[in-house]
């Protein structure tokens, strides 16, 4: 990453599930802490799959985090001595997080936001696309497709072992769903509207 010469900016870490987003966020948090910077870490209260008060990677690494229900709550915990604001699972917040993050960066804070850029349908997820557009730095990570081993940019939702339908809720709380990384060609979403362009190249994949 290039070196910032001024204080106050936004970094976004995005990708599919199992791509190492939380691991990368934790790495940046620990690096800042090693540099004696004050870091405040946040996560949405809805994200309690592994822990209610920690950011936990799939490798088992973790850092303590403050669970918040709304973006505006971040301001209650951030002070003039804070240097870095880290936010995990940012896709679960409302679009209000965009203004909050912009305000923090404009006030001189280094903001690091990590989250899914696509939902299980393979469509833009919540505020993440806007944050990517506004960020000074975007790191898009890829996992490994569980079907073919190719780079995976999408998240496959499975319900009882079968691909979830397009009409399923974007966010499921307390459901018995499972997820795995998939590439573009092995990502399955039954019921997803087809988009066919009237162009000869559109038929190439089926030839």
Curated annotation (Swiss-Prot):
GO terms for biological process: DNA biosynthetic process; thymidine metabolic process. The active site is at residue 89. Residues 184-207 are annotated as: Disordered. Residues 184-197 have a biased composition (Basic residues). One of its GO terms (cellular component) is cytosol. Transmembrane segments: none annotated. ATP binds at residues 15-22, 88-91. The keyword Membrane does not apply. The keyword Kinase applies. Residues 198-207 have a biased composition (Basic and acidic residues). Zn(2+) binds at residues 145, 148, 183, 186. GO terms for molecular function: ATP binding; thymidine kinase activity; zinc ion binding. It catalyses: thymidine + ATP = dTMP + ADP + H(+). InterPro entries: P-loop_NTPase, Thymidine_kinase, Thymidine_kinase_CS. It is found in: Cytoplasm. Pfam families: TK. Gene3D superfamilies: 3.30.60.20, P-loop containing nucleotide triphosphate hydrolases. PROSITE patterns: TK_CELLULAR_TYPE. HAMAP family: Thymidine_kinase (MF_00124). PANTHER family: THYMIDINE KINASE, THYMIDINE KINASE, CYTOSOLIC. Belongs to the thymidine kinase family. This is Thymidine kinase. It comes from Geobacillus thermodenitrificans (strain NG80-2).
